[in-house]
């Protein structure tokens, strides 16, 4: 049926599904599964009202990978209250997941407090916003005042990309090719 011709993807919250449900997703031809790794710090996850726990992140991605899905992680750093150690722990967790092979692709971004969100409201109330020029709310620069200098925050996010493009990653991607049509998609994934 159509479930073999239509490839599906979705966003997921770590810690919500068990192995049986990931297996069902794979049987329904889900492929790409995006997990937001907002932080490795439990205190930040609670503060931004994320129902997943840091300890659930690795297990969830391993189950998705075991089911044959292709986990993608969006790693975020740059909260106003985040310490250097907490930001580095989030980056380190992302690298560890990637090195273990439980995620296929990743993205590192600077947290942006979008209007209408509780984070934006808190930033405005506490004077943490650097600008309200909406053209700059594109994840390419820090918009909030943080403990980390802007240059260091930018270096953290850029550093994650240079650390993943290894021979092991390239081999893993080549071995995962299921059809010639995927080769073009793989090229788009690697070019960041």
Feature roles, as predicted:
Residues 20-23, 80-99:
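Catalytic cores of alpha/beta
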